[in-house]
């Protein structure tokens, strides 16, 4: 295949696709260039069907060379995917997965490799576009294309694929994907936006998606391959009819048992009895394994059909609830002692239960993120754990998987919108959600538990946040939207639409579906139903704890902040860290200073924090014109005296500014070590300070300022050295730097006295 290039302008950038040049042994491969972001996507398919599920794997690989950076760590090589890469892979997987045929079992891999990275041209958007297109032009059976975009909301306007600056100004961060007809994936964080604004964003995003799909269709028409014939998993129709006729009523009764564990036991007993009958019947048949495989699919299909029939026809849910009814709710705080942990919340919804624990720490404990973007500190972390005991099973136990990372990130987006600013609350914040029981919607339970933990821990959040999961049963013509779906409804339903927010608006959305897409009407109904449910949950949370506690837990670290000028950071740190180490040694605190000058001081002892803050304030303090100080005399010269205002800040009091009457000698007015009251009169551009004592003394009645003789012009040699360098500036700097070399300063001040106050001059007339 020869190289082909296709380009369009999309959302203010050039989108270019290249095919036929690289990765030609893959079933399909494309290079997508969006702005200066370049992503190579390759799609491959296994030769044979495997297993009883569809093994789709989507990867998003961030290569550090793409941003001109070295990987961190000892080995200087990319290792496990970053959290962002994992979330991006999930983001691409979710809209692609529903686009494969029922019964398709061949393994499919879609690998996205970021070759160059432009922070203002989304790698996620490019990779999702490339994933769909690589599958669409390949011989892999794929009912696409799909595409996705990012949407921002600024000043009442929706912006497609925003830049970094636009994202920072936006009250919405939305990823939306779909096919030409409908939306099939949503992921969003928002600053308490209304349902109407969110729906508008989804529709604006889908309109942009349609443009990308039309572009893909043009490319497929020119370079697409003929789709391969693959064997789909089909059950024996005669066997299916036989089993349904004989056992459907038994399975229906089992499915209608309301309590989860009892229902699971009942359905398991019915299925095992049926399998036992057919195992004996076909014991000697060489196709026994295929028969049993088909039988498992048939029984799963029967259960699937009964759950959906109950909901759509009888309007009865498996646990007996109404379509829009929430399971029983319970909320509790302080599950563990406040003397040890910083805040806990236990939230229960039916048979789903989550325990969230808050930990506060200074900002130097924040997570450092070093990816393709510039390195930064992540202040808020929400981690989600799903142990197998929560569903009464044994299984894998270890590092979090993609699902746990994804659910943690969803909770993080939902809650971070209501957190106080770093200036208001100078802590790094970590929430860990332990799912203790699960029967659906555990991610939303973790959000509710997180709200309880934050409020119990004294974090001054703007408002409590609650989350609810909505479901959908659709036959293509009619549909039913379900509130608070349980595990069975999630498993056999068509949609899992999670909505989190406050009473003011939505803070997070996530939608996954198993059908090709859903309409705006369904989305609007689901959002409205979710709002009603969210308010019910907030009632329970607020009845448990109405406002965040005013005091932190006794076990929480004490932190205070002081903002210092950026140019003073080096003063606080000192040469080689000498100054900051001295403060730490004296007070026993720990100190963290960010690039913006926010200085966080933390300790278990509040008095130590106060002392450290006092020292730092003194170090960065600056004199201001008009301020009055009690200053100590630190040096006396014939023309005046130097006084210490505070710290290392000195000021010069000229002899003429010591009194209204003529002062013959400085020593007549003050001596070393005296404390005198002075007023700041002038600060020059080099930071040198002139002060006055007489400005604080009432002018004598009838006082007349002495007449000053005009200055005589002197040869430059009197004021400059042989290189033309002005010695006066250097002289004064020598004093300010405590160098001890004041010879130039003396000459400067002596010359000043001679010219300005000839009556005080000791110089002989020329």
Swiss-Prot record:
GO CC, one annotated term: cytosol
Domain KH: 557-616
Task performed by this protein: Involved in mRNA degradation. Catalyzes the phosphorolysis of single-stranded polyribonucleotides processively in the 3'- to 5'-direction.
Assigned protein family: Belongs to the polyribonucleotide nucleotidyltransferase family.
Compartment(s) of residence: Cytoplasm
Chain residue ranges for the region called Disordered: 700-766
Extent of Basic and acidic residues compositional bias: 700-734, 744-766
PROSITE patterns referenced in this protein's UniProt entry, alphabetically: KH_TYPE_1, S1
Binding site for Mg(2+): 490, 496
This protein's name: Polyribonucleotide nucleotidyltransferase
GO molecular function, one term: 3'-5'-RNA exonuclease activity
Catalytic activity: RNA(n+1) + phosphate = RNA(n) + a ribonucleoside 5'-diphosphate
Upper taxonomic lineage: Bacteria, Bacillati, Bacillota, Bacilli, Lactobacillales
Top-tier EC class: transferase
A UniProt-annotated Pfam family: PNPase
Cofactor or coenzyme needed: Mg(2+)
